[in-house]
Design a protein with these regions (language model features):
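Glycoside hydrolase catalytic-domain context in secreted enzymes
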Residues: 20-613
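Repetitive helical segments and hydrophobic/amphipathic motifs
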Residues: 11-12
Length: 613
């Protein structure tokens, strides 16, 4: 019996040992990349360990859910889809629109991404195109067209740094700026976002601006690749210009447009956004030759390429899935799909499953995205600057930018003004921060009114004068001179396209003409200030005014205008585009082979100063 019992025990032990030997050995816990590794080594590790689903998620940029919860990605969806990026579109702001509410929103989305299966932090994007312009009471700088008139590289660097400083305060990590295109047809609603018509000036400004914008761990985005300012009237939205077709030869691309992006690449820009427009009939979002062969290949761009907002809708394809597959295969790495992010995610996976998107294409996209995330420090705990909006430095830089952007076009001995003069200040742009700042200010389209901190032109004169400031035309006999602030309505993208450039046209105000006609016979000096992104036609009214200043869209710091008009500083700005005499000249630029400066109301580069005015 003992022998039998012993035998049973031996058999039982053997069975246990056998079972243990055949149990799968537990996998060691997956280790994350070591801090001592190079970025290249860290990214390679991720590419080897991420699932295809996690990789697809990294290629998606969704919009944060709106305050009413109707659209956009929730925190839960950010986690479950392993989303690589979140954006706030123009005007999509958290409740309260304060630094604290922005920071809380950004942190919530970051924490949601860290809870995903990959644990990779999101990169958070925002349109801060002339300061942190969605945030109430931020510093609003002049739009690009005015900065092109100033043509000061060091000033561009300072503006970039101050913009990055305010953007970083709110937890953002990606800025959809700068726009580095050139302008041809000045009726385009995005004229003010360009750097004018001279590629040499643009190249002079792009590098310093990007270097400044990428301060404080922010990734800048050069846009919109490529040639979006050269679209032909009638081919765009609503039969006008925006998102239209540009007829550009290979030689023009190589000589004029692509060098601007090479400047951005050489400055280390982290991202490039593709244009809604087409080149020679081919939508840029499906132009594999320009995106993959030229931009990533010949030009050696190492950052990631992002689509524009829902731009895949315009790509050729029988359905949304086909459009996404075509877009990814063209070389776009991150898809800005604010509301269809889930469909875009599934489309990438479907393309992979059907062998219509190769794994190498997905790995290239994710590698680029992760490289940028490492380069700007997203895998580390955020090191945010203290909240300090509209601080002394940012206001000083903005005021300088306004001063240097002003272009004096006419002066019949009426400028500089004396601070002892009594003045009449009139016009739609005289006391309106919204008009003064233009589109992309607080909301996508911008808005009339004084809804954010700043100094209007009227307030600037009131602050600086020793005389009396009047605001009613009935007081004409009380004043020494009249300042009439002509203006264009705030607008963005195709909403700003105009059929003509008349003062009372689609984007103008009837009040512009009414005031000029009312002032046509007065016996005191009349000085016009133009607040406009486009050169509104002044040919019929130039003789009405004794002085004419092009102020473009100066932003919130109106004191920069009085600094120069009172003679504390001289004019420096020069026209960044050709100012047409008639509408037929609206597409003429200084690059035209037979360009004659005498043909125009004011030629490219024109700008007076006090000694020669």
């Amino acid at each position: 019996m003992k022998k039998l019992l012993t035998l049973c025990v031996i058999i039982l032990i053997a069975m246990v040992l056998y079972a243990c030997q055949n149990e799968p050995t537990p996998e060691p816990e997956m280790t994350k990349p070591d801090d001592a590794w190079t970025i290249e080594e860290k990214v390679a590790w991720w590419i080897n360990h991420l699932t295809i689903e996690e990789k697809a998620g990294q290629m998606i940029q969704a919009e944060r859910t709106t305050n009413n919860g109707v659209s956009g990605a929730t925190l839960f969806e950010t986690t479950s889809y392993n989303l690589g990026s979140i954006l706030n579109g123009g005007g999509n702001v958290p409740v309260g629109n304060t630094v604290t509410s922005w920071l809380n929103m950004a942190n919530n989305y970051r924490q949601a991404s860290l809870k995903s299966t990959s644990g990779i932090p999101i990169i958070y994007g925002v349109d801060a195109v002339h300061g942190h312009n969605n945030l109430v009471n931020s510093t609003i700088f002049p739009h690009n067209i005015g900065l092109a008139a100033a043509n000061n590289p060091e000033l561009m660097r300072l503006i970039g740094e101050q913009t990055a400083y305010e953007v970083a305060q709110t937890g953002m990590s990606m800025n959809f700026s700068p726009s580095i295109g050139l302008i041809k047809d000045k009726r385009w609603g995005r004229t003010y976002e360009t750097l004018g018509e001279n590629p040499e000036v643009a190249k002079n400004l792009i590098g310093p601006y990007i270097e400044g914008l990428q301060s404080y761990h922010i990734a800048a985005t050069a846009k919109h690749f490529v040639g979006d300012g050269y679209t032909v009237f009638g081919t765009g939205m609503d039969g006008r210009l925006d998102r239209g077709n540009a007829n550009i030869t290979e030689e023009e691309l190589l000589d004029i447009h692509l060098p601007l992006y090479q400047e951005a690449i050489d400055a280390g820009v982290k991202s490039i956004m593709i244009s809604y427009s087409s080149i020679n009939g081919v939508r840029m979002h499906q132009n594999k030759h320009l995106i993959t062969d030229i931009l990533k290949g010949d030009m050696q761009f190492k950052g990631f390429i992002i689509s524009d907002y829902e731009a895949t809708n315009d790509v050729s394809g029988s359905n949304f899935e086909d459009k996404i597959i075509r877009t990814v295969n063209a070389g776009i790495d991150m898809l800005m799909e604010p509301n269809k992010f889930d469909q875009a995610y599934r489309a990438i996976l479907a393309g992979y499953d059907k062998n219509e998107i190769e794994l190498s294409r997905i790995n290239d996209a994710v590698s680029r995205i992760l490289t940028v995330k490492y380069e700007i420090g997203l895998f580390d705990e955020p090191d945010l600057p203290d909240a300090d909006l509209r601080n002394e430095t940012s206001l000083s830089v903005a005021r300088q930018a306004v001063r240097e952007s002003l272009v004096l076009l006419k002066n019949d001995g009426v400028l500089p003004l004396s601070k002892d003069q009594d003045l009449l200040i009139l016009g739609p742009g005289s006391h309106n921060i919204g008009i003064q700042s233009g589109g992309w200010t607080i909301t996508w389209q911008g808005q009339e009114g004084n809804s954010t901190e700043g100094t209007t032109i009227l307030e600037a004169f009131q602050a600086e004068t020793n005389g009396t400031i009047y605001t009613s035309i009935d007081d004409l006999d009380q004043v020494d001179a009249v300042i009439v602030v002509l203006a264009e309505k705030p607008a963005a993208e195709w909403f700003g396209d105009s059929d003509d450039l008349s003062l009372n046209g689609r984007t103008g105000y009837q009040e512009n003409i009414d005031l000029l006609e009312a002032l046509s016979d007065v016996d005191i000096p009349v000085i016009a200030i133009m607040i406009s992104g486009k050169p509104l036609l002044m040919t019929d009214y130039l003789e009405v005014v004794d002085g004419f200043i092009m102020a473009f869209l100066p932003g919130t710091e109106g004191l920069g205008i009085t600094d120069v008009m009172y003679g504390d500083y001289n004019f420096k700005g020069q026209l960044p585009y050709t100012y047409p005499k008639v509408l037929a000249q609206v597409t003429h630029t200084m690059l035209d082979p037979n360009y004659d400066p005498d043909d125009y109301l004011f030629p490219y580069g024109f700008g007076l100063t006090y000694p020669d005015a």
